[in-house]
Amino acid sequence: MSLKKSPFFELRSGSVDTLLFTVKTTDLDALRAELVKRFEATPEFFADDVVAIDVRRLADGERVALADIRQMLNDVRMRPVGVVALATQGWAGEAGLPLLEARDRRAPAAKPADEAEPAAVPAVETAAAPAAAAAPEQSSDPAPTLVQAGGQTLVIDRPLRSGQQIYAKGDLVVLAPVSHGAEIIAEGNIHIYAPLRGRALAGVHGNHDARIFCTCLEPELISIAGIYRTTENPLPADVLGKSVQIRLEEEKLMIEPLRLT
């Protein structure tokens, strides 16, 4: 075969980042139900994102119907491109998807210089909400406001009205109120130095180390890495309307008062 370089195409070694969808159960009905619950409130977050199905967490001898999982992911608008499996999981190559190699990488937590210390009081612990958040109020705006920043901190210094949406690829700092029906989304941390009455979603591409900091917590929805809580599960009095930080601990949202003075 000729090794002459072609002016029309090039083949070379490379790597592409994808999300890993880690399968931890063989109960596909339970898996489907959990997918629906996670995505029904925020279906656009992973829309058209490529994903690799990771079956390495399954116990020895366990196997799943990868074709069914592939369809589940398509149903929530994700695009499966391959399977990550152990050498002993030979069945993983039978679904028509290529076998991929993966190096697990956990996104590092951002450490703001002026991050406030949490008060030494018990945290509020909550799991994912059992139902989707209520639909946002109607707005006279013709379309949501969408702002993107290429991995750097995005600062918003104007009030956000119902129907407006902000998306930051890094951290997001908001210096004005977030009204009911407004939505702020970040792949990193979110800092809100004003009342939060709409939705705040941090770490939306799976960053479990992301946090939300807020000086007045009155939200419709809060979420980190897909784990969310809505107003259907009322907040305790010691954090409602107060300054707080929100973080993940073992797949649960922890809401902790902040000591700012």
UniProtKB/Swiss-Prot annotation:
* Keyword S-adenosyl-L-methionine part of the UniProt annotation: no
In terms of InterPro entries, this protein maps to: CAP/MinC_C, MinC, MinC_C_sf, MinC_N, Septum_form_inhib_MinC_C
Would you say which domain of life the source belongs to? Bacteria
Biological-process GO terms, alphabetical: cell morphogenesis; division septum assembly; regulation of cell division; regulation of cell septum assembly
Alphabetically list the UniProt keywords. Cell cycle, Cell division, Septation
For bias type Low complexity, the affected ranges are 118-144
The record's region (Disordered) falls at 106-144
Signal peptide (UniProt feature, chain positions):
none
Question: Is Disulfide bond set as a keyword in this record?
Answer: no
Subunit: Interacts with MinD and FtsZ.
Q: Which NCBIfam families match?
A: minC (TIGR01222)
Stated family: Belongs to the MinC family.
Q: What does this protein do?
A: Cell division inhibitor that blocks the formation of polar Z ring septums. Rapidly oscillates between the poles of the cell to destabilize FtsZ filaments that have formed before they mature into polar Z rings. Prevents FtsZ polymerization.
* Name of the protein in question: Probable septum site-determining protein MinC
Q: What species was this sequence derived from? A: Burkholderia orbicola (strain MC0-3)
